[in-house]
C-alpha cells in the first residue's frame, strides 16, 4: 500500500511516501511559512523522484490537528481533494501522536506539546502509539499535574521549544527522569504520519474536519450568528 503523507500543522512543511509502514522518501522544509504555495510543488517533486503519479497512491494521510489553523486547512483540503477526485482512501493522524513517534524507541512517557501561548499547550502523552493523556488544550500547570500522576519514571517532552519553561517543568516533575527535546528532535515528520496511517481509520472526505482542540475566533462568530453550539466534530468548515 502506497501512502502519501502531508504535514502542514507546524511552521515546518513535510511530505512523505511510505510503502505500508516502510518510509520510502521524506521531504522536510524547516520554518517554512508558505505552505499553501510550497505544498503542491513538494508533492510533485516527491512523486517524480520515485517515478509515481497521484494515481499510484492508495491512501492519503494528513496531520489533522492540532496546530496552525491555516496550516491545518491547507493540508486537509489538499488531501481531501486528492482522495475525492481519485477515489482513494483518506486518513487523519493526530499531530501530537506523530510528534511522539520521534521517540518511539524510547522506554519513556512521551509528552507531545505545541505552544498555544500564555503557558497553554496543545498536548497529549503517549506510550508508544497508546494515548495515556488525551490530546487536549492544557495549561502548563494542569499538564504537569497529569503527567506527574502517572507511574512512568522517564518522561520526554517533544514538539516545542521548552527552554523558557524548563525550570517550571523540572520543578513540577522533580521526581521524574526528565528530558526536553531540542532542535531537530522537535520536527514533525510526514513519514511518522505515514506509519501511523497504516492502521488509522479511513475517513469520508466530505465529512473530515480539522481537530483544532479549541475554537477559532471565526467559530465563535459562527456560533453567535447561527445560535448553534460549536462541537469539535461538527461540520463547521463545510457550513461556512
Task: List each model region and its residues.
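N-terminal beta-alpha supersecondary unit
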Residues: 1-64
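Short beta-strand scaffold segments in enzyme catalytic cores
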Residues: 13-18, 121-125, 211
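Surface "functional belts" at beta-alpha junctions
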Residues: 22, 34, 89-187, 229, ...
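Residues at secondary-structure transition points
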Residues: 30-38, 69, 73, 77, ...
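Stable alpha-helical structural segments in soluble proteins, enriched in small hydrophobic residues
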Residues: 46-50, 85, 103, 190-201
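DPxDG-like acidic metal-binding loop motif
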Residues: 61-90, 95
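Acyltransferase
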Residues: 179-240
Amino acid at each position: 500500500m502506497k501512502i502519501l503523507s502531508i504535514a502542514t500543522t507546524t511552521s515546518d512543511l513535510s511530505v512523505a511516501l511510505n510503502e505500508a509502514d516502510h518510509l520510502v522518501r521524506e521531504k522536510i522544509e524547516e520554518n517554512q511559512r508558505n505552505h499553501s504555495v510550497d505544498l503542491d510543488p513538494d508533492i510533485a517533486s516527491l512523486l517524480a523522484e520515485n517515478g509515481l503519479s497521484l494515481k499510484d497512491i492508495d491512501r492519503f494521510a494528513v496531520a489533522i490537528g492540532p496546530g496552525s489553523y491555516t496550516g491545518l486547512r491547507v493540508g486537509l483540503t489538499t488531501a481531501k481533494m486528492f482522495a475525492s477526485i481519485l477515489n482513494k482512501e483518506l486518513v487523519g493522524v493526530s499531530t501530537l501522536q506523530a510528534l511522539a513517534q520521534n521517540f518511539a524507541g524510547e522506554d519513556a512517557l512521551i509528552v507531545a506539546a505545541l505552544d498555544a501561548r500564555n503557558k497553554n499547550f496543545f498536548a497529549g502523552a503517549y506510550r508508544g502509539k497508546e494515548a495515556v493523556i488525551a490530546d487536549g488544550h492544557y495549561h502548563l500547570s494542569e499538564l504537569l499535574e497529569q503527567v506527574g500522576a502517572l507511574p512512568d519514571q522517564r518522561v520526554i517532552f517533544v514538539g516545542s521549544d521548552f527552554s523558557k519553561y524548563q525550570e517550571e517543568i523540572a520543578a513540577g516533575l522533580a521526581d521524574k527522569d526528565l528530558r526536553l527535546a531540542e532542535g531537530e528532535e522537535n520536527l514533525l515528520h510526514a513519514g511518522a504520519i505515514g506509519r501511523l496511517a497504516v492502521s488509522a481509520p479511513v475517513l469520508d472526505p466530505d465529512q473530515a474536519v480539522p481537530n483544532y482542540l479549541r475554537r477559532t475566533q471565526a467559530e465563535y462568530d459562527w456560533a453567535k450568528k447561527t445560535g448553534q453550539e460549536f462541537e469539535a466534530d461538527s461540520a463547521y468548515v463545510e457550513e461556512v
